[in-house]
Amino acid sequence: MRVLGIETSCDETGIAVYDDEKGLLSHALYSQVKLHADYGGVVPELASRDHVRKIVPLIRQALADADMTIEDLDGIAYTKGPGLIGALLVGACVGRALAFSWDKPAIGVHHMEGHLLAPMLEDDVPEFPFLALLVSGGHSMLVGVEGIGRYTVLGESVDDAAGEAFDKTAKLMGLDYPGGPRLSKLAAKGVPNSYRFPRPMTDKPGLNMSFSGLKTFAANTIAAEPKDEQTRANIACAFEEAVVDTLGIKCKRALKQTGYKNLVIAGGVSANTRLRASLSEMMQGLGGKVYYPRGEFCTDNGAMIAYAGLQRLKAGQVEDLAVKGQPRWPLDTLEPVD
């Protein structure tokens, strides 16, 4: 089975073709980073318009790279939510139109399920069950995964997501958009333990997380300290240490609670080098294993949508003709794939 995946939930237009026998056949991606840089963040209306401009050329590119035409496809998957409604509707409209025009089955995919399953695109894939840490600009959650569609949200951020905290703290430090990766680059030059930032909610039972207070603590520290480059690097390092430690503590607690031996890290923040190293060391000490996608599949992409959609289409799940976008869509409400 060969499926075209369409991702347009935020500021990346991602298109891919996935074959259940041969694997990923093509992958095309356009990022809107330069478009939004002057505004310091994503402008929804601009994002939607840019998706409109880029989506059809990228579909043509992905099909050409796979040496295929639309007639060769067995199905179409598009991101249905969560995300920016205007951006979602661009992908949903194009996906539904292609499916209707060429009489192909179509499925709307949950964006975070795509991230959760992104490690399945690699050669070394996790076996069910496992614990998933999903960390991005819009979400931070711990999910118990018994199978595709069999998800239990064990804990999540009660305010800012980890990626959002990275971006907002970077902005406070005067770093250009996108701030998260730039903050991490600055943090690599910092001296560890120069500052002690709090580890929010780690002193309380449960698996929920909070990062807004950490952002406020960073803002106060930035305002009170000198503005030289080394001090800024030390503050960035302390902030990153606090986020990584907090996520690690929550993961360890969740693993103990569930008894799972494997951990999946996915979402944009999963590309963070310090987070990967810390959780890999933790899992080695626990006798388990950690899985994460390659860098290009940590951020939003069409490949993860094609893969997730293929699993559901193979199970006979198909969307009706209505064009739907769901800006909010709880992960644990998805239908299981038997």
Swiss-Prot record:
Biological process annotations from GO: tRNA threonylcarbamoyladenosine modification
Binding site for Fe cation: H111, H115, D300
Annotated organism of origin: Shewanella halifaxensis (strain HAW-EB4)
Keyword Cytoplasm set for record: yes
Catalytic activity: L-threonylcarbamoyladenylate + adenosine(37) in tRNA = N(6)-L-threonylcarbamoyladenosine(37) in tRNA + AMP + H(+)
Cellular compartment(s): Cytoplasm
HAMAP family named among the record's database cross-references: TsaD (MF_01445)
Cofactor(s) essential for the protein: Fe(2+)
Name this polypeptide is given: tRNA N6-adenosine threonylcarbamoyltransferase
GO CC entries: cytoplasm
Residues where substrate binds: L134, V135, S136, G137, G138, D167, G180, N272
Family under the similarity heading: Belongs to the KAE1 / TsaD family.
GO MF, any single term: N(6)-L-threonylcarbamoyladenine synthase activity
Chief location: cytoplasm
Function: Required for the formation of a threonylcarbamoyl group on adenosine at position 37 (t(6)A37) in tRNAs that read codons beginning with adenine. Is involved in the transfer of the threonylcarbamoyl moiety of threonylcarbamoyl-AMP (TC-AMP) to the N6 group of A37, together with TsaE and TsaB. TsaD likely plays a direct catalytic role in this reaction.
Enzyme Commission code: 2.3.1.234
Taxonomy, superkingdom: Bacteria
Cross-referenced Pfam families: TsaD (PF00814)
Keywords tagged on the record: Acyltransferase, Cytoplasm, Iron, Metal-binding, Transferase, tRNA processing
PANTHER family found in the cross-reference section: TRNA N6-ADENOSINE THREONYLCARBAMOYLTRANSFERASE (PTHR11735), TRNA N6-ADENOSINE THREONYLCARBAMOYLTRANSFERASE, MITOCHONDRIAL (PTHR11735:SF6)
InterPro entries in alphabetical order: ATPase_NBD (IPR043129), Gcp-like_dom (IPR000905), KAE1/TsaD (IPR017861), Peptidase_M22_CS (IPR017860), TsaD (IPR022450)
Cofactor note: Binds 1 Fe(2+) ion per subunit.
